[in-house]
Regions:
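Subset of outer-membrane beta-barrel
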Residues: 24-382
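Bacterial Sec-dependent N-terminal signal peptides
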Residues: 1-27, 237, 309
Length: 382
């Protein structure tokens, strides 16, 4: 991709700074944060089930969704690699999300895990307002984390993770008089998992996750000009039924809520809007988590819902389907997805496809998104 942006417009879109974004108007209450790539579904298995994965059966990708699942994993050590071309339906060819996750069970009750996400925004050519070329940049973002999870009772486990986040969008002075730098943050995850499956694998599972609880990100030395990261509360439930020795069906639901308050409503009065925005930006991180439940907007519209199912034959062939729903006032992402998987010995491949929807200006820009994932079980049964 070689997109040309006027520099001012690039800052408006790429920097993800709340003070540069439009405040909510009318019934539109989209929450803006830095590093939104942290909320992109990274793996193909979850992608085939409408981005549902908080309470599904554990594999290496659990490090992205709910690492508390990992002590209940059947394999002692596993690694997952995933690749997602992003916004292909818009003609972009070099924007992608790549991810890696791995875990190792220290014993039958605890596990160590790690995950890495790398998001490339492609090649972007910057120009000034006169059309003069400034330079070419390749913005990128990544996160890396380490986690520990442990079974605390026969059916319940807890997990914690520490994450480093780096967002390198613009570096140095590119003709505006402002010196930009990479934005960094440190965040944590806390999660719980209930495993009610019996020896055959049938039963109820559910989980709770608190993800990306961490410091704001800034792209300049101005301490007042920092943005929230996408803190999130997730609840998930799934049920697995084993029809016979060869056939298994799992279905479930995830509900997610961003722990970031909406921008203050625009009044049209510059002094008032400036004061409201300054007050919003001065909100502390911990305070913002609680304020997200009382920011003056319709809280029912703030919940994102994923429903999905997975059919497995002989734990070798997998078929998946799901649906993701987000209210129109919060971004209007609504799509169906399908997926498939094949497993042989220590190797598994997963694919997912986001079904096209809408047409013209209403066409979903995520249409035709394909995710590819590989899973390697390095050591045997737990």
């Amino acid at each position: 991709m070689k997109n040309t942006f006027r520099f001012g417009c690039f800052l408006l879109t790429a920097m993800m700074s709340a003070n540069l974004l439009s405040a909510q108007t009318g019934s539109i209450n989209i929450v803006s944060t830095a590093v939104p790539f942290l909320r992109i579904s990274p793996d193909a298995r979850a992608g085939g089930m409408g981005d549902m994965s908080i309470a599904t059966t554990p594999d290496a990708n659990a490090a992205f969704w709910n690492l508390a699942k990992l002590p209940f994993a059947e394999k002692r050590t596993a690694v997952a690699v995933n690749y997602t071309p992003w916004l292909k339906d818009l003609g972009l060819s070099d924007v992608y999300l790549a991810s890696l996750a791995a875990y190792h069970k220290v014993n039958d009750e605890s596990a160590l895990s790690t995950s890495l996400r790398f998001f490339s925004l492609g090649n972007i050519q910057l120009t000034d307002f006169s059309g003069n070329i400034l330079n070419n940049i390749r913005p990128s973002e990544f996160s890396i984390d380490l986690g520990y999870s442990r079974i605390i009772s026969d059916k319940i486990s807890l997990g914690v993770a520490l994450r480093y986040i780096n967002s390198r969008l613009v570096i140095g002075d590119v003709g505006t008089g402002v010196v930009y730098r990479a934005g960094t943050s440190v965040a944590g995850d806390v999660s719980m998992f209930y495993n009610g499956r019996d020896e055959s694998g049938a039963g109820l599972t559910w989980g709770i996750t608190l993800a990306n609880l961490g410091a704001k990100i800034g792209y300049t030395n101005d301490a007042r000009n920092k943005d929230f990261i996408p803190a999130n509360l997730g609840l998930g439930v799934a049920y697995t039924t084993v029809m016979d020795g060869n056939n298994r069906l799992m279905f479930g639901m995830d509900i997610n809520k961003m722990l970031v308050p909406s921008l203050p409503a625009a009044t049209g009065v510059f002094s008032t809007d400036s004061a409201n925005l300054a007050n919003y930006r001065s909100t502390g991180v911990v305070s913002s988590w609680f304020k997200s439940f009382s920011d003056g907007t319709n809280q029912l519209s703030a919940f994102q819902v994923s429903v999905g199912a997975e059919y497995a034959y002989n734990e070798q062939f997998f078929v998946r389907a799901g649906y993701f729903y987000e209210d129109k006032s919060r971004g209007n992402r609504q799509y169906a997805s399908v997926g498939a998987g094949f497993s042989m010995d220590a190797f598994q491949v997963n694919l997912s496809y986001l079904v096209p929807s809408g047409s013209g200006i209403t066409r979903n820009p995520l249409s035709n998104t394909i995710r590819v994932g590989l899973l390697f079980n390095i050591s045997g049964q737990k």
